[in-house]
Amino acid sequence: MAKKSKNLRAALEKIDSTKLYSVEEAVALAKKTNFAKFDASVEVAYNLNIDVRKADQQIRGAMVLPNGTGKTSRVLVFARGAKAEEAKAAGADFVGEDDLVAKINGGWLDFDVVIATPDMMAVVGRLGRVLGPRNLMPNPKTGTVTMDVAKAVEESKGGKITYRADKAGIVQALIGKVSFDADKLVENFKAFHDVMAKAKPATAKGTYMTSVSITTTQGVGIKVDPNSL
């Protein structure tokens, strides 16, 4: 713990908490101040001036990052018949029906993404209390309720991320790993920023993005100038 605190203090000394860094500066600083002993994740956070209690100001969706996430996702698909075979051929890790429901209700959660064909949602709905709080419930807005299961599996395996504004209007997203080249992290960051900018609700008032920051696992938040994106 003492060593971690020392590393954290050292990282804080390199960051000016009053400054808005350009995206290039922020990415370089995030990599430089990372002290985790593993290939840490790089995440961004957007504090949005929205009221998620209003249906027209809820922000949720999915996108495929141009350079992937550096993470291998374990994909579970609820499908039957030909669609189940398509999912398997596309590389899904787990494919099934009621058998998977029983397994998940028994406490098994060794997967990162859940995809379902529309006809399977009545079955998947029984898992709402388990999948919902973990943001794993299939949803048409994130492309995880679809008949094109092959495409959904391939995208999930190839760098697709989902995002959702929480009750405070904060959206967090993974944009890569510390081991990524800085230019690839910058490209992913800019791609996600474009999505966030386009997601601005028409009814949102005032400054839409009140703050944007980047951090690594166990790292320090670095404020980013939205205009540099």
Swiss-Prot record:
NCBIfam families: rplA_bact. It comes from the Bacteria. This is Large ribosomal subunit protein uL1. One of its GO terms (biological process) is regulation of translation. The keyword Ribosomal protein applies. One of its GO terms (molecular function) is tRNA binding. PANTHER family: 54S RIBOSOMAL PROTEIN L1, MITOCHONDRIAL, LARGE RIBOSOMAL SUBUNIT PROTEIN UL1M. GO terms for cellular component: large ribosomal subunit. Signal peptide: none annotated. Binds directly to 23S rRNA. The L1 stalk is quite mobile in the ribosome, and is involved in E site tRNA release. The gene is rplA. The keyword RNA-binding applies. Coiled coil: none annotated. Keywords: Repressor, Ribonucleoprotein, Ribosomal protein, RNA-binding, rRNA-binding, Translation regulation, tRNA-binding. Belongs to the universal ribosomal protein uL1 family. Pfam families: Ribosomal_L1. Part of the 50S ribosomal subunit.
